[in-house]
């Protein structure tokens, strides 16, 4: 029995080695001469991962700032590399899906290794997964961290309340257009938003880490939202990429 468990255990370090070059940070950048008076030159907002052509990046829609400081020449950027050797590449939003909180960015420069996407609808409860990203990016910097767990449940993004009087406007909207999300037993932190959730053995992406969208609906009634982590299924990433072709 112990021997049967070894291949899966040994697979994660090898998988992480393949995944890591495709993980990027998403944020904003300002020219150094403008940064002092208008905040930091670099601002990490979340995580993204490279797909498709190697110049396409998937992240959460909520990671993208609603507006940029034009006076300070602030620009949307993707940060590649590791630690002090990282570089900023200017990015632009190609397509977005606010309803499922995913966005597709395009970056310049040399193509990066792209992650493969799993087929939609193949995730099973109990499946071993991992996700890699930049938790607390502004503090910990460009050092990607990996967390491991399982898919605990495939669950609706919102569950109807006992009384309609307790429903928020966001919950009502979600009840009218429901979809399932993945509940994970691994903990994500601020900065992990947009991280790819992938199968431990194959490395194929099955979802995108998201807490903001789900907690507005599924846990809206809780005074202290739980530490449960959720992920948006990869089918919505596929739809975004298909629409960009």
What positions do the PLM features span?
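N-terminal signal peptide c-region/cleavage motif recognized by signal peptidases
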Residues: 5-7
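N-terminal activation segment of mature serine protease catalytic domains
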Residues: 9-61, 92, 100-102, 124, ...
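Active-site substrate-binding loop(s) of clan PA
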Residues: 14-15, 92-94, 108-143
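Active-site region of chymotrypsin-like
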Residues: 22-35, 39-41, 106-116, 144-242
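Catalytic-histidine neighborhood of serine endopeptidases
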Residues: 52-98
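Short, conserved beta-turn/loop elements at beta-strand boundaries and strand-helix junctions
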Residues: 53, 96-100, 154-160
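Short, surface-exposed secondary-structure boundary micro-motifs
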Residues: 60-62, 134, 202, 211
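Beta-strand/loop subdomains of soluble extracytoplasmic proteins
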Residues: 72-77, 82-91, 125-130, 144-165
């Amino acid at each position: 029995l112990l021997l049967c468990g070894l291949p899966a255990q040994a697979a994660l370090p090898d998988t992480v080695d393949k995944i890591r070059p495709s993980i990027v940070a998403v944020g904003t950048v300002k020219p150094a001469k403008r940064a002092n008076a208008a905040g930091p030159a670099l601002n990490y907002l979340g995580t993204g991962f490279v797909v498709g052509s190697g110049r396409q990046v998937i992240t959460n829609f909520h990671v993208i700032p609603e507006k940029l400081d034009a006076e300070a020449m602030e620009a949307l950027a993707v940060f590649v590399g590791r630690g002090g050797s990282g570089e900023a590449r200017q990015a632009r939003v190609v397509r977005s899906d606010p309803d499922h909180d995913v966005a597709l960015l395009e970056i310049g420069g040399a193509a990066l290794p792209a992650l493969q996407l799993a087929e939609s609808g193949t995730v099973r409860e109990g499946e071993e997964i991992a996700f890699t990203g930049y938790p607390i990016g502004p503090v910990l910097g460009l050092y990607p961290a990996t967390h491991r767990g399982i898919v605990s449940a495939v669950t609706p993004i919102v569950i109807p309340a006992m009384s309609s009087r307790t429903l928020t406007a966001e919950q009502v909207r979600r009840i009218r257009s429901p979809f399932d999300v993945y509940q994970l037993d691994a903990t994500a932190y601020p900065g992990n938003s947009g991280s790819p959730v992938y199968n431990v053995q194959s490395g194929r992406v099955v979802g995108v880490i998201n807490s903001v969208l789900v907690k507005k609906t599924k846990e809206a009634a809780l005074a202290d939202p739980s530490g449960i982590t959720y992920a948006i299924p990869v089918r919505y990433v596929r739809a975004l990429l298909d629409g960009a072709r």
